[in-house]
Amino acid sequence: MPQLSKSLSFDGRDIRLELGLFAPQAGGSVLISSGDTAVLVAATRSTAREGIDFLPLTVDYEERMYAAGRIPGGFLRREGRPPERATLTSRLIDRPLRPLFPSWLRDDLQVVATTLSMDETVPPDVLAATGASIATLVAKIPFYGPMAAVRVGLVGDDFIINPTYREIEKGDLDLVVAGTPAGVIMVEAGANQLPEADVIEAIDFGYEAVQELIKAQQSLLAELGIEQILPEAPNADNTLENFVRDRASSGVQQVLQHFSFTKSERDAALDEVKASVVEAIAALPEEDPVRSVTAAEPKALGNTFKALTKTLMRQQILRDGVRVDGRKLDQVRPISSQVGLLPPRVHGSGLFQRGLTQVLSIATLGTPGDAQELDDLHPDTQKRYLHHYNMPPYSVGETRPMRSPGRREIGHGALAERALLPVLPSKEEFPYVIRVVSEVLSSNGSTSMGSVCGSTLALMDAGVPIKKPVSGAAMGLIREGDEYRVLTDIQGIEDFLGDMDFKVAGTDQGITALQMDMKIHGLPLEIIADAINQAKPARLHILNKMLEAIATPRADLSTYAPRLFRIQINPEQIGLVIGPGGKTIRSITEQTGAKIDIEDTGAVTISAVDADSALRAKSIIEGMTRTITAGDVYIGKVTRIIPIGAFVEFLPGKEGMIHISQIADYRVARVEDELTVGDEVVVKVREIDQKGRVNLTRKGIDPEEVSAARAAVEAS
């Protein structure tokens, strides 16, 4: 392929494309850059796999630490398992890309995006998503593209395209929009309780920029002389389809209209209908075409029956406006919320159930040292709020090996985490590190939004002073031509057989998180707006049900939660608290049993299993760092005696010396005649010398000063 360079501009930011220079043996590749961030994306196609009924597409996003001029940590000093954010970026690329391949394609496809260079300004994820479309088109893989993605930020009252990390942090919106010529195909967003109208406007704003990138890709293909392949499905033999439709349509319709069925009863009834078709096929002569098809393709019957069920369910919703469980299109399943179900060793817990979906969320409070250290290319290096999502096989009545979290679990956990971030208290207000684990105990659709609701309950039960409670709902879509129906609170079968899964989370003030995935090639803004607006009353209904279990965060933390105190010291005194080689801070920890975390700003967080230990450590540090002036009066204890005087600890960790001449108003021959180690004495600061040493006296102290000093001790 000849080398080709192209440059585009958005809001003063350039996007540069380089083709034909890298990865010559890949099916198609592009280096896509903006600022000093550069991502190489390669797409490759292999021959079709035999005997599969799905598209074997793999999308991998790879980060290399050299991209930021860094060497990886760890013993091996090389990249290992992808960090969580890299996994989320892989999903961000995959989700708008996957629906655009034809359903009949069985070729092995792999898209690999590698960040080769990265500055601390431009995020690489949307570049990688757009690059994936370009690489796929250049590779001449059957594809209903082009597809492009942009990020939309909101700084003040202005939307901006592809904001920098700093602009994202300052703004109230971080939204990624991906689209095709047919419309919007994917949305992912975190927002600071934005109204629905603002989010819809942002999606529209982003899609306008997406269209420019789509036109640029079409122009690029023309320059390269590549004719886009618009795939056509191979000619299919309808013999089996007609047979199944004739034998099973009536039975499937009866099952779908039996609204009192539970999920398991419905599944069993559909299996019975399918079994009757199997019996009918078995009774056919061996040379019958239907029997020949099922013998040659063992999965053909199952796929055909599934397609029939999908068609009939969709027709029922479009025609009658009624769903398989009898609900109206905008109706939410029955809801149950409970808190504090687990023993008190657990800091906070919430059980949320919506229909057959049940999520148990558990909140744990930790110290600042429990924050997750992040070793990736993102500017953020720590996380103080963690949400982890688990979905064991028993949640869907299945058995399979238990594995470490996969991409789905990581993605669902991150979405629920994002939904709660805007309402969490600041580190200054609530210095705890917070971890919530959502255990999906039963799944029938919308477990990620169930995790949002369960997380809210668990945090409130744990006494975390969240600004607002958050709830979430998953919206679905059935669309045939220009006719469509938006479904509220979709269950498993509607998710599986529908066209859209649109998750919306937020408070009574506005949206905090969005995630929209498609199975079709794009949607107009009108339908997206309908889904967002229809989600609001559902969210508020769910929220009101949750608040029946717990209306406000608990006033007190669990007895078993660590106790934290946060104080501010002069950054110049950090060395004083730490001491040479950490000697002083270790001594405080050994004396009190408390854990001490000091930030570069001078913020000190003191934590312990009980309040008394933390308060003792707090008192010591405050004493060490307190500003002492001549004339201050303290109550102290004698710690050492030397021939010329005595040392007194007048503040925790702070000592001064009383010279023998300052012990009494009369002449003292021996210090031991007046003082012994352990004596409580009232002392006044006489002076602080040039070396910072404190000289004390017992002379000239008024009774009022003694009373004030004793009152200060009692108050502390």
UniProtKB/Swiss-Prot annotation:
One of its GO terms (molecular function) is RNA binding. Pfam families: KH_1 (PF00013), PNPase (PF03726), RNase_PH (PF01138), RNase_PH_C (PF03725), S1 (PF00575). It is found in: Cytoplasm. Its main location: cytoplasm. Signal peptide: none annotated. Residues 562-621 form the KH domain. GO terms for cellular component: cytosol. Gene3D superfamilies: GHMP Kinase, N-terminal domain (3.30.230.70), K Homology domain, type 1 (3.30.1370.10), Nucleic acid-binding proteins (2.40.50.140). It catalyses: RNA(n+1) + phosphate = RNA(n) + a ribonucleoside 5'-diphosphate. Its cofactor is Mg(2+). Mg(2+) binds at residues 495, 501. GO terms for biological process: mRNA catabolic process; RNA processing. The keyword RNA-binding applies. Involved in mRNA degradation. Catalyzes the phosphorolysis of single-stranded polyribonucleotides processively in the 3'- to 5'-direction. HAMAP family: PNPase (MF_01595). This is Polyribonucleotide nucleotidyltransferase. It comes from Synechococcus sp. (strain ATCC 27144 / PCC 6301 / SAUG 1402/1).
